[in-house]
């Protein structure tokens, strides 16, 4: 049993033997056990004498990066590809889950365009005998390091299909991994393939200049796309006030209307001309039609452009990446491993404890009051406070005086909620040309006659997510508000609805479905509309509390990837070690100009 699970069963506090914890030791109360909260906890234990106490409202570790288990199968919420331009994040991951030289897809030759980074991976050797009393699966692999090249972007793709570019240092780095490998605690190297499903046809994602694309679009539409793009380059919309302006400037009006407008509005439930252009800066950044065409030409005509051992990382937009790292049993495996380490090193993790009140004395937070599933209340005092809870809830929980304008901004923040329906099938109706399973990790469904937004094929993320390799395990993704009829629909009705939709567009035959499972995830995506244009009023107020640090996606109301969320936590710990936390630098993560623009 994972160590943190013991806390779910009722253990209130866990103090590791030999850690020397005392009643005088400083404490950090961390609200939330997602990537940001868990990173903060482990960093504090590794680098300071501060004891982390994590309070998680749910019964699961990992936040939206958790892995759902259902009858031996596993589901990844939204899909989490492990890359990072941050050397620090990459090393952090590698220390915990080194690449598996034995696993399926562990190809040492990983090619992208741009600069490369080398990662030391243990050489292949025979397994040592299992340790006595640990069972047949406890054998460890021990080996000296071997060098392979691996991409190190990070992408936690959002529902829009776009992804972040995060550049935290430009130096080529050799990442070291431990010499002892648990055969299950590893990263696989997986091929990435994503496509758009539109007009009941598959298009490359991102759109590429290929014969298939031209055939699918038809001559007339292709000409309109080209002319429209040229017009957009000649006459740019300035200033870019909305997401619509942002997309037209980069893709042209015709391509925007064909591939972006209806799908984006399906995802967000809001017209593109009412969504802040900052959303595009966060999620699309360096990608444009020009970028996609250049990438295609390099792959097609430049020697070594495809199949080379070079790794495309800091010079390639993450939407163009072709291989990625992935924990053997899904992203939640890594975060559960981190939770075990936190508890083992003397930290505490309290599951199903929701923070409802934050006690303040002036501009200093002194304690939080939380309630568990049985209604029991407890006060947790601390010296430092990390919050990953939604900012709307944070402001409501503060017992300090809150200005009316700040309450107004917080109350007006909006979130998009998420539903995924897992379907276990005998087969898919659509297949590769050779009759094999589609190789896509996910498919963006842009058909306007269904609500379905995206489809994952979990088999292609990791074969270990599927209990029966002869079956196909897919996830149908829906984006809604918690006030929508779709969100309120009973599970069985929602299963029938989802099956009917994916059958309607020709992906499966309804009779091939063996089983289904529904997962609802509230406040998955912080929105860039509502009162967001006044967000600075809110952030200035929360920053005024000297020992309160907002980190993570919902904690900062920023559409961050998991590596950016981790970096916010690391930056706070850096500041605590240095004696001063620069809160402005926290808001700068994933928003610097370098992230927003293509490199010239």
Regions found by a protein language model. Give the residues of each.
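Conserved flavin/dinucleotide-binding core of flavoenzymes
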Residues: 4, 8-14, 67, 137, ...
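N-terminal Rossmann-like FAD-binding beta1-loop-alpha1 element of flavoenzymes
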Residues: 26-54
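Hydrophobic anchor at the start of a short beta-strand
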Residues: 28, 51-52, 385, 513-516
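Conserved Rossmann-like nucleotide-cofactor binding loop
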Residues: 36, 60, 392
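Glycine-rich FAD pyrophosphate-binding loop
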Residues: 45-70
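Mid-domain catalytic core of redox enzymes
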Residues: 47, 327-328, 351-506, 534-535, ...
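Active-site/ligand-binding neighborhood in enzyme catalytic cores
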Residues: 190, 201-206, 210-361, 366, ...
